[in-house]
């Protein structure tokens, strides 16, 4: 059994607007059994050419009630309220009923595995009935300004709990996670850090809408299923040795290394290939990633403490709950990590107070509002340097209780290397992925020790901070 989870802004679950063209064929269910006459030998132009007109007599085809058939919309039918599917059930049904594999057979997905469908921050919502779902709370599409919504950190906690619950079912062999192609790399990396499992987690995307010309989602899903059932990931017989992966365009990439670089099929780079998914050969691994993940991650859910220390906004600290009695992430634990992007030729010095890119203001805000917070500096590639004003303010941020990770800009290939105290070196992670790992570290280690005077910490305060930063550095070096 493969669990299929519909996540936010998933293009793979999106469709063109219905009713835009009255002649457009849309998969619909037949209301009753139907017998129709088709022209003989009209399924292929060569057959039409080779057969005489007398051999093109009508042939009767019988279609059953409830069968999906591509037909024009009935007269007067209006556009659908939402273009996204609320889950992947209908998508899988259409792919199996209306599409064929290269051998001309339908039911490609159904022949490979059985499926159970779930929703975790899905792209469409059920807005009727006694408990209508709410845009931006229960579901997250993209599109026109008034009809799009982005999930927040609370939604990420909900997603994490849901996926952990799903993989815990004994009959689930693996998970397909469906999300929007520009952002799946962040969520997938997070799931690979937090989810405690030996089962594969496969990210699935599409660059083009389902039902549209050149739609790529169907083949990506088939390749993802083939990867799961191949057991190629189970190298030592102990479970997944690869970690969360993105399967798209016939390539299996690690969640940590994959990046979207273009808005088209083939628009991902990095992360492999761990394996390739050619249709004619079995899937096998090309290399095994060495970073810790899932069942071996130092920040997986089972390794997180029940409580961690957070700042209280009054110069002291308090304990905040990370997990409830059942081991699920507590809904009220909402860490915050801001990305500071450095570019040369900014304003240096002066009385405007903007030379540090707003870091001091962000620190003041975090002290008042967020007990668990941190920063990622996206500095010069690959070493993460910025201006002295920015670095000085970020140093004070660390001694205020907010750890700071240095990263190179863009999609760095070389690691940051050794950073000056009191910063964490972000290895070769992008700023967005370093942010996800720092969020996980805040859940594992809590806030950094805060100095009485963050601009002038004592030797003892420096040692306490260094010990804390060392714990984070070990995680960043291995995950």
Predicted regions and their residues:
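Active-site histidine-anchored catalytic micro-motif
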Residues: 1-479
